[in-house]
Amino acid sequence: MSKIVKVIGREIIDSRGNPTVEAEVHLEGGFVGLAAAPSGASTGSREALELRDGDKSRFLGKGVTKAVGAVNGPIAEAVTGKDAKDQANIDKIMIDLDGTENKSKFGANAILAVSLAAAKAAAAAKGMPLYEHIAELNGTPGKFSMPLPMMNIINGGEHADNNVDIQEFMIQPVGAKTLKEAVRIGSEVFHNLAKVLKSKGMSTAVGDEGGYAPNLGSNAEALAVIAEAVKAAGYELGKDITLAMDCAASEFYKDGKYVLAGEGNKAFTSEEFTHFLEDLTKQYPIVSIEDGLDESDWDGFAYQTKVLGDKIQLVGDDLFVTNTKILKEGIDKGIANSILIKFNQIGSLTETLAAIKMAKDAGYTAVISHRSGETEDATIADLAVGTAAGQIKTGSMSRSDRVAKYNQLIRIEEALGNRAPFNGLKEVKGQ
């Protein structure tokens, strides 16, 4: 009953108005899985390739008809007749057929959409929710947890048209007892932040991930206005709410220095920027920093891990790009202590699960993440619960492409009850 009978690819639109790939996988018995590939703005150079058409007369070159053609042609042909429940085999067939190191023939966007759609179809055929099927694929059947959200309430860097260098300033509602309560706390702080910004004559326009994108006097000012909003919402910083940042430092790494426009174009060495971040962690309860240096600055990361790694979570995103080969090298060299998981960086569900397992086996944490270009597809919510990853990044409290994931988590928590504990701050490395 789980044999694939039809695969359909189509070009749809993501949250930035750019095209992306959606795939439908149909099984015997009428079961269907539907999934869409997300798309990043600040991308690691070693990510699997997102195939775009490059035809400037259509969608400014960002069309995905080549990737969709791969889904409807060679991929559909190769997986039709195969068992969708055998995820590893489905993914291997596509990866082998593509035959490139970075999925550049068909595009990671094509392969991932089919990979996720196959998983959803298989879950339907088994008569179980996707998170339950993922737990079985992960070799951890029946083991679930609700993730602690990192809510990106101030957007900067590549995610916003403002003067803030650091890409994401996030709150973690660690005082919550449930995911649903964490969402409520996040919402209350988000709305209070709007009031704080308005009172200072600042913009409340939002960036790609639904957080506010004001122009600020410095990067530290972003933390200061968040602290004000937390207090205004009736919560205590450090007790009810902790902070996290994604520096996306590769985006302001120029000629071996970290050049911060928001700090008067000051240039920092790796060591100096590490101490700049360390100073911020002394002023505010920052418990997690992502991509605190450039993806190629491994010596700098070794230093940063030595200075900060036993105190806070250091997450590798552009650094590791959800790739087990690169992650293994990082683990062997003691670089960072956590990995960001974005399944379009690697391009299949099987490889994503392998990266999560490798991280956990090494004592690293795994943070499940959206991309800045998203759709209504909420698969990452099921991925976070089904792997008991413990943490999720899926944006702020606005934009339905972000909120779709929180709403799916609320539904899952309701369905699982105490089978899926919400562990809060205990999920964060070093806390």
From Swiss-Prot:
CDD domains: enolase. Keywords: Cytoplasm, Glycolysis, Lyase, Magnesium, Metal-binding, Secreted. PROSITE patterns: ENOLASE. Its EC number is 4.2.1.11. (2R)-2-phosphoglycerate binds at Q167, K342, R371, S372, K393. Its main location: cytoplasm. It is an enzyme of class 4 (lyase). Binds a second Mg(2+) ion via substrate during catalysis. Pathway: Carbohydrate degradation; glycolysis; pyruvate from D-glyceraldehyde 3-phosphate: step 4/5. It comes from the Bacteria. This is Enolase. It comes from Erwinia tasmaniensis (strain DSM 17950 / CFBP 7177 / CIP 109463 / NCPPB 4357 / Et1/99). The gene is eno.
